[in-house]
Amino acid sequence: MVVIIAMKCVCIKPNNSFHIGECGYGIEQTGIFPHSDTIFSGICNCYAYIKGRDALENLIEKFFENPPFLISSALPMIFLNNNNIFFLPKPKVAPGNLDYELGKMFKSGEHISFSAFKKVTESSLRATIKDLKLLSKCIVTSDEYNLIKDKDFDYIKCDHKARNAIGRLTSKSSIYYCGISAFPKNWGFYFLFKGEDAWLKNIEPSLKLLSDEGLGGERSIGYGRFKFDIKEIDVPTAEDSVLMTLS
């Protein structure tokens, strides 16, 4: 059974590429979406800049007993005017109500839209290949596919950019490479906020500063900047014996 819960979310539209540092062999890799600890760290740094270190320490102390708010890791979304499509991580265990062809397609996806998640978790229905479509690495419903298919739809790409470092002692230059994630115009990401609206308003100035300062690494060359909007969305959750973590 799927239960719909209304939650606040922060929708982020990237202005340029992001560098979310991850371990790599020889080249620093990049993640596509920032995790919750990266987002929280960025908010805290900006919170301290605006309100001072003491205010930040008072805020952090609250999390040891009764956290005033919780945030999820970032998840992908597609901006389509008034028909934005939000995605969840694809369940690790495929639902048992999929037919054979859809089951094979399900393995190839990485994320699943809210509507598709609701469809495959309704145990009373048997989802077929006609109900869902695979668009790049995302599983969407047939209706969502029809909204997207005629648009310039490219999935988020990871690439490597050459950088130059100058030695402080020798003044010699050396080339190194870092990973970046490039967002096409229709793509962005969001994170969920669980807490009182007063706390969301309290950290909103920090989010505004963070959008100018940048989120993630390589901010000195302009990476990680974005625009954001706060919305209330209906999040599907399945009442079952398994759970899905969003952080």
List each language-model region with its residue ranges.
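Conserved active-site/ligand-binding neighborhood in enzyme cores
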Residues: 1-247
